[in-house]
Protein backbone atom coordinates (compact mmCIF):
# COMPACT_ATOMS: atom_id res chain seq x y z
CA UNK A 1 0.00 0.00 0.00
CA UNK A 2 1.31 3.43 -0.95
CA UNK A 3 0.11 6.45 1.04
CA UNK A 4 1.10 10.05 1.63
CA UNK A 5 0.00 10.98 5.13
CA UNK A 6 1.40 14.51 5.22
CA UNK A 7 0.33 16.98 2.54
CA UNK A 8 -0.52 20.69 2.61
CA UNK A 9 -2.95 22.59 0.44
CA UNK A 10 -3.43 26.23 -0.46
CA UNK A 11 -5.26 26.57 2.86
CA UNK A 12 -1.81 26.71 4.48
CA UNK A 13 1.54 26.61 2.66
CA UNK A 14 0.82 24.13 -0.14
CA UNK A 15 0.56 24.88 -3.84
CA UNK A 16 -2.38 22.57 -4.70
CA UNK A 17 -6.01 22.99 -3.66
CA UNK A 18 -7.52 20.13 -1.63
CA UNK A 19 -9.22 18.83 -4.77
CA UNK A 20 -5.99 19.03 -6.76
CA UNK A 21 -4.21 16.98 -4.08
CA UNK A 22 -6.83 14.25 -4.46
CA UNK A 23 -6.48 14.31 -8.25
CA UNK A 24 -2.68 14.14 -8.01
CA UNK A 25 -2.92 11.21 -5.58
CA UNK A 26 -5.18 9.40 -8.05
CA UNK A 27 -2.83 10.23 -10.94
CA UNK A 28 0.24 8.73 -9.25
CA UNK A 29 -1.61 5.71 -7.88
CA UNK A 30 -1.68 6.37 -4.14
CA UNK A 31 -3.95 4.13 -2.10
CA UNK A 32 -4.64 6.91 0.40
CA UNK A 33 -3.71 10.53 1.03
CA UNK A 34 -3.99 12.76 4.10
CA UNK A 35 -4.43 16.53 4.17
CA UNK A 36 -2.66 18.08 7.17
CA UNK A 37 -2.75 21.84 6.73
CA UNK A 38 -1.04 23.99 9.33
CA UNK A 39 -3.37 24.91 12.19
CA UNK A 40 -6.59 24.77 10.18
CA UNK A 41 -9.30 22.33 9.16
CA UNK A 42 -10.71 24.76 6.59
CA UNK A 43 -9.82 22.61 3.58
CA UNK A 44 -11.00 19.26 4.91
CA UNK A 45 -14.62 19.35 3.72
CA UNK A 46 -13.52 19.99 0.13
CA UNK A 47 -10.79 17.35 0.47
CA UNK A 48 -13.07 14.58 1.76
CA UNK A 49 -15.76 15.41 -0.80
CA UNK A 50 -13.20 15.26 -3.62
CA UNK A 51 -12.01 11.89 -2.36
CA UNK A 52 -15.53 10.49 -2.56
CA UNK A 53 -16.07 12.03 -5.99
CA UNK A 54 -12.85 10.70 -7.53
CA UNK A 55 -12.60 7.39 -5.68
CA UNK A 56 -9.56 8.19 -3.54
CA UNK A 57 -9.28 7.20 0.13
CA UNK A 58 -8.74 10.39 2.11
CA UNK A 59 -7.58 10.93 5.68
CA UNK A 60 -8.65 14.17 7.35
CA UNK A 61 -5.74 15.65 9.28
CA UNK A 62 -4.11 18.77 10.65
CA UNK A 63 -0.59 19.85 11.60
CA UNK A 64 -0.44 21.81 14.85
CA UNK A 65 2.37 24.26 15.57
CA UNK A 66 3.13 23.57 19.23
CA UNK A 67 5.80 24.32 21.81
CA UNK A 68 7.82 22.21 24.23
CA UNK A 69 10.66 23.64 26.33
CA UNK A 70 10.71 26.77 24.12
CA UNK A 71 11.12 24.69 20.96
CA UNK A 72 8.58 24.58 18.15
CA UNK A 73 7.31 21.07 17.46
CA UNK A 74 4.82 20.05 14.79
CA UNK A 75 2.20 17.54 15.88
CA UNK A 76 0.14 15.94 13.12
CA UNK A 77 -3.36 14.73 13.89
CA UNK A 78 -4.79 12.04 11.60
CA UNK A 79 -8.35 10.72 11.26
CA UNK A 80 -9.87 13.97 12.48
CA UNK A 81 -13.63 13.65 12.83
CA UNK A 82 -15.92 16.36 11.48
CA UNK A 83 -17.59 16.53 14.90
CA UNK A 84 -14.28 17.79 16.31
CA UNK A 85 -13.68 20.54 13.74
CA UNK A 86 -15.29 23.16 15.99
CA UNK A 87 -13.19 22.06 18.99
CA UNK A 88 -10.02 22.35 16.93
CA UNK A 89 -11.05 25.74 15.57
CA UNK A 90 -11.60 26.91 19.14
CA UNK A 91 -8.18 25.61 20.21
CA UNK A 92 -6.54 27.45 17.34
CA UNK A 93 -8.44 30.75 17.68
CA UNK A 94 -6.11 32.21 20.32
CA UNK A 95 -3.07 30.83 18.51
CA UNK A 96 -4.20 32.48 15.28
CA UNK A 97 -4.54 35.79 17.10
CA UNK A 98 -1.00 35.52 18.49
CA UNK A 99 0.29 34.42 15.09
CA UNK A 100 -1.26 37.43 13.37
CA UNK A 101 0.37 39.74 15.90
CA UNK A 102 3.69 38.03 15.18
CA UNK A 103 3.19 38.38 11.41
CA UNK A 104 2.35 42.08 11.68
CA UNK A 105 5.42 42.65 13.84
CA UNK A 106 7.53 40.79 11.24
CA UNK A 107 6.27 43.06 8.44
CA UNK A 108 6.86 46.11 10.63
CA UNK A 109 10.41 45.01 11.50
CA UNK A 110 11.22 44.31 7.84
CA UNK A 111 9.98 47.79 6.87
CA UNK A 112 12.47 49.40 9.26
CA UNK A 113 15.28 48.11 7.05
CA UNK A 114 13.61 48.96 3.76
CA UNK A 115 11.77 45.71 3.01
CA UNK A 116 8.36 47.27 2.42
CA UNK A 117 5.35 44.93 2.34
CA UNK A 118 1.60 45.58 2.54
CA UNK A 119 0.20 43.25 5.20
CA UNK A 120 -3.42 43.74 4.16
CA UNK A 121 -2.50 42.92 0.58
CA UNK A 122 -0.80 39.70 1.72
CA UNK A 123 -3.80 38.77 3.88
CA UNK A 124 -6.28 39.40 1.06
CA UNK A 125 -4.28 37.10 -1.22
CA UNK A 126 -4.74 34.08 1.06
CA UNK A 127 -7.55 31.56 0.67
CA UNK A 128 -8.95 31.88 4.19
CA UNK A 129 -7.51 35.16 5.46
CA UNK A 130 -4.82 33.50 7.58
CA UNK A 131 -1.28 34.67 6.88
CA UNK A 132 1.76 32.47 7.47
CA UNK A 133 5.44 33.05 6.87
CA UNK A 134 5.22 31.31 3.50
CA UNK A 135 2.87 34.07 2.35
CA UNK A 136 5.29 36.71 3.59
CA UNK A 137 8.19 34.88 1.93
CA UNK A 138 6.27 34.90 -1.37
CA UNK A 139 5.61 38.63 -0.99
CA UNK A 140 9.32 39.27 -0.42
CA UNK A 141 10.10 37.31 -3.58
CA UNK A 142 7.49 39.14 -5.66
CA UNK A 143 8.94 42.46 -4.48
CA UNK A 144 12.40 41.34 -5.58
CA UNK A 145 13.93 41.41 -2.10
CA UNK A 146 14.87 37.71 -2.40
CA UNK A 147 15.17 35.38 -5.37
CA UNK A 148 13.00 32.60 -3.94
CA UNK A 149 10.78 31.60 -1.05
CA UNK A 150 13.56 29.28 0.10
CA UNK A 151 16.02 32.18 0.25
CA UNK A 152 13.56 34.20 2.33
CA UNK A 153 13.27 31.39 4.87
CA UNK A 154 17.04 30.92 4.99
CA UNK A 155 17.73 34.63 5.51
CA UNK A 156 15.24 37.35 6.43
CA UNK A 157 12.64 35.09 8.03
CA UNK A 158 15.01 33.25 10.36
CA UNK A 159 14.75 34.28 14.01
CA UNK A 160 18.47 35.02 14.22
CA UNK A 161 18.09 37.90 11.76
CA UNK A 162 15.90 39.70 14.29
CA UNK A 163 12.85 40.43 12.15
CA UNK A 164 10.80 37.38 13.09
CA UNK A 165 9.62 36.97 16.68
CA UNK A 166 7.89 33.57 17.06
CA UNK A 167 4.40 33.64 18.59
CA UNK A 168 3.51 31.73 21.73
CA UNK A 169 2.17 28.32 20.78
CA UNK A 170 0.01 25.70 22.54
CA UNK A 171 1.79 23.00 24.53
CA UNK A 172 2.81 19.94 22.52
CA UNK A 173 1.64 17.63 25.31
CA UNK A 174 -1.72 19.41 25.55
CA UNK A 175 -2.36 18.98 21.82
CA UNK A 176 -1.41 15.29 21.99
CA UNK A 177 -3.85 14.81 24.88
CA UNK A 178 -6.63 16.57 22.97
CA UNK A 179 -6.04 14.46 19.87
CA UNK A 180 -6.25 11.33 22.02
CA UNK A 181 -9.52 12.61 23.43
CA UNK A 182 -10.84 13.09 19.90
CA UNK A 183 -9.97 9.48 19.07
CA UNK A 184 -7.44 10.67 16.48
CA UNK A 185 -3.87 9.56 15.80
CA UNK A 186 -1.07 11.91 16.89
CA UNK A 187 2.29 11.97 15.13
CA UNK A 188 5.45 13.94 15.85
CA UNK A 189 6.51 15.38 12.49
CA UNK A 190 10.18 15.76 11.45
CA UNK A 191 11.45 15.21 15.03
CA UNK A 192 15.03 16.33 14.41
CA UNK A 193 14.08 19.67 12.87
CA UNK A 194 14.24 21.49 16.21
CA UNK A 195 15.47 18.83 18.64
CA UNK A 196 18.68 16.88 19.04
CA UNK A 197 18.78 13.22 20.07
CA UNK A 198 19.00 13.90 23.80
CA UNK A 199 16.07 16.32 23.69
CA UNK A 200 14.03 13.82 21.70
CA UNK A 201 14.78 11.05 24.20
CA UNK A 202 13.60 13.33 27.00
CA UNK A 203 10.42 14.33 25.15
CA UNK A 204 9.18 11.01 23.78
CA UNK A 205 8.35 9.21 27.08
CA UNK A 206 6.27 12.19 28.22
CA UNK A 207 4.60 12.45 24.83
CA UNK A 208 3.84 8.73 24.78
CA UNK A 209 2.27 8.98 28.23
CA UNK A 210 -0.02 11.71 26.86
CA UNK A 211 -1.01 9.55 23.89
CA UNK A 212 1.54 10.11 21.13
CA UNK A 213 1.14 7.31 18.58
CA UNK A 214 4.06 7.74 16.17
CA UNK A 215 6.88 9.81 14.73
CA UNK A 216 7.58 10.46 11.07
Feature-to-residue mapping (PLM):
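Amphipathic alpha-helical segments that form well-ordered structural scaffolds
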Residues: 105-112, 139, 174, 178
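Glycine-rich, often acidic, oxyanion-interacting loops/wings at catalytic, nucleic-acid
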Residues: 131-136
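An N-terminally biased module of ancient metal coordination in phosphate/nucleic-acid-related enzymes
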Residues: 1-72, 155-162, 170-216
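Conserved phosphoryl-transfer catalytic core
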Residues: 97-123
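N-terminal helical cap/lid subdomain that shapes the substrate entry/recognition surface
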Residues: 126-130
Amino acid sequence: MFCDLHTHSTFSDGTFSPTEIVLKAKEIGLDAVALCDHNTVAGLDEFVLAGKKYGVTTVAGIEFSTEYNSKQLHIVGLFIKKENYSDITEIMAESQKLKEESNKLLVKNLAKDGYILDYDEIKNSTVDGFVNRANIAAALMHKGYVSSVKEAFQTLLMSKFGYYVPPKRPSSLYIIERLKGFGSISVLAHPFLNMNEDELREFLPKAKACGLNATE
